[in-house]
């Protein structure tokens, strides 16, 4: 929200990433933007896009379950959203090179689902099996408790 929206929907920089126009939500108000979602308030569009930015890393969590410390997972999510999700979002939805080539992504098929599936598969392959898998039975647990 502080920089991701700007990197995704800021002024196009060579089709690769958005500029820092909206960093810290600067210029995001209740008036419609001139080029981004011209039929609804800019703030509403930003919140709608935040929903996708939240759901996408949540889909990856299944690959990390019981394989990574929560603090490491949070660091991964911040880095992944900055260096993977934001550029991909800009490419497809924010006026980047794929958008200019005519790519259409309805309901997040490429930006959300393909990126989270690729990240989850890569993470599962890199991290490997859970510690103790096949050697002992796992005790049930509840993370919030």
Features from the language model and the residues they span:
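Hydrophobic alpha-helical transmembrane bundles of multi-pass membrane proteins
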Residues: 1-145
């Amino acid at each position: 929200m502080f920089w991701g929206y700007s990197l995704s929907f800021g002024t196009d920089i060579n089709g690769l990433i958005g500029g820092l126009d909206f960093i810290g939500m600067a210029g995001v108000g209740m008036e419609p933007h001139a080029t981004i979602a011209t039929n609804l308030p800019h703030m509403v569009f930003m919140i709608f896009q935040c929903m996708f930015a939240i759901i996408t890393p949540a889909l990856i969590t299944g690959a990390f379950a019981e394989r990574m410390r929560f603090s490491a997972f949070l660091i991964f999510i911040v880095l992944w959203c900055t260096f993977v999700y934001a550029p991909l979002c800009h490419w497809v939805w924010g006026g980047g090179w794929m958008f200019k080539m005519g790519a259409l992504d309805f309901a997040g098929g490429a930006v959300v689902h393909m990126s989270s599936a690729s990240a989850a598969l890569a993470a599962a392959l890199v991290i490997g099996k859970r510690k103790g898998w096949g050697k002992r039975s796992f005790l049930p647990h509840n993370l919030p408790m």
